[in-house]
Amino acid sequence: MKYDISRGTLAIVPNSEENSLVYEDDSRYIVNETPFKIMEDSCKYFGSTYNGRKDSAKSILGAEYKVPIIVEENNNIIVFPTTSPSSADCVWISLGIRK
């Protein structure tokens, strides 16, 4: 299953070496891609690159590590890594999470 991050995405969690669990408002999916691959593909889907979005966030925020990534600005799709994005344990949390 291919997955692109959307407004309904809450979290992307590593499930195994090559799989992810994606949590949405009312659903949970197993995706046959790593969380980082989902991030890269989603940034491309919305017309940019992961590295371009990361570099912009670093420049604007003056931060170096674990910067939030604006996946799609018109719908405020913003995700935060819980650890280094290159780590196999990195979980991506959406700014859109609500109680």
Where are the regions a protein language model picked out?
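Eukaryotic intrinsically disordered, low-complexity regulatory linkers and tails enriched in Ser/Thr/Pro
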Residues: M1-I93, I97-K99
